Amino acid sequence: MVIDREGATSAVILRFTAGKPVEFPAEFVKEIGEKAGLTILHHKDRVMKLFPVASDNIYLLRIEISDLSRNFLKQLNYAFNDAKLSDIIFTTGVCLRGEKCYYECYFVPDQLVVSLDELEDSLKMIDGVSRVVLRKVE
């Protein structure tokens, strides 16, 4: 397989077979330079995103929002700043799925200056938050 290197991007078609691994071109793997990738499926858009990562210690933070206010993002930003959570691999931002409103992000917890439990507790205190899920991605 020849990879087009002329422009800003390269593309290949990958074949999906249920229950079978997806194989990436050797040139892609070499250029990425990492041994693992965080793969995210965005349900609404049916889009998969792949992020090369150096660590497999990655957490999902999902906040279910029952009442989205103008202050939600400000309070979320304060909680992230207090925890020193700034290096986020991917975020949905605030989005709807059906009747529910969510904020989701994926991050490496090594950057935090608080425990995961402390981060979770601070997020639960934000007005309008009905549920917080914080778990390691497998």
Ranges and model annotations:
Residues 2-10, 36, 41-138:
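A conserved regulatory-domain signal marking ACT and ACT-like small-molecule sensing domains
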Residues 9-42:
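Short beta-strand-centered segments at strand-helix junctions
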